[in-house]
Design a protein with these regions (language model features):
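Sec-dependent signal peptide recognition
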Residues: 1-8
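Active-site-adjacent helix-turn-beta-strand microarchitecture at beta-sheet edges
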Residues: 86-160
């Protein structure tokens, strides 16, 4: 079979990109970094180090993984937390629940219902509205609660305002309709909630997505030459691979 040069270049470029989980995408004039995990990947949540203190940084997590011959392919902050880095809502790590589910409305973004839970299951991923999660709780190897939901069944959160001037750096997670792919997104600039939600729906084809946080949002993506520093973090989600 003959293949044109342009087609061959495209094929090789796609093969090269397949090994890098993170890429930059543009939507409505704004840039976002998108990192993907697939069902079967070693995607984990991290909170406390073996000594019981919060990891707080990508570097400490990577150092702990080195002891098992592994490293972070990418990572980002994964939900809201108190001043001592305890999760605000549900937190499950390696099957152990460290913080309970919160289903009541409350102050701030977390309490802007509907909020939701990101679940890493045995066979894939899910983003589920918190009260629905409470009614029919799936088996989650890892789970983190945050808020607000960005998308519920393809619909933008009802309290988001198109054209809002409340623009911040933001990060979130969405799941493909078949549950086989999780998309972790961080904006490269300031974006409002409505625009961020529509990126998941219109650029990634996601129907359910969850906001993770705003100004403190950080990304570790060695393949992009990026590892953001800052104040100590609470929960972190990361894709783990052999060194």
């Amino acid at each position: 079979m003959k293949m044109g040069l342009a087609a061959l270049i495209a094929l090789l470029a796609g093969a090269a990109a397949a090994g890098e989980p993170c890429r930059e995408m543009r939507h409505e004039g704004l840039r976002h970094v998108v990192c993907e995990a697939r069902a079967g990947d070693d995607l984990r949540l991290f909170l406390n180090a073996p000594d019981g203190t919060p990891f707080g940084s990508f570097g400490r997590i990577d150092a702990a993984l080195a002891a098992e011959g592994a490293a972070l392919e990418f990572a980002m902050n994964a939900g809201m937390y108190h001043a001592d880095r305890r999760p605000v809502g549900l937190y499950v790590e390696a099957g152990e629940e460290a913080a309970r589910l919160v289903t009541s409305a409350g102050p701030g973004n977390f309490g802007m219902l509907p909020n939701g839970v990101f679940c890493i299951g045995q066979d894939g991923f899910a983003v589920i509205e918190s009260r629905r999660f409470a009614e029919d709780r799936p088996a989650c190897r890892h789970a983190t609660q945050s808020g607000p939901m960005l998308l519920v069944a393809g619909e933008v959160h009802p309290r988001f305002i198109p054209g809002s001037t409340s623009r911040y750096l933001r990060n979130g997670v969405g799941v493909s309709p078949d549950g086989g792919t999780a998309y972790f997104v961080i904006s490269r600039g300031r974006v409002n909630f409505d625009g961020f939600a529509r990126f998941f729906r219109d650029a990634l084809g996601v129907r359910d997505a969850l906001y993770l946080d705003g100004n403190i949002s950080r990304l570790h993506a060695p393949g992009l030459g990026r590892s953001d520093a800052g104040l100590p973090m609470g929960p972190v989600v990361g894709l783990v691979a052999p060194r």
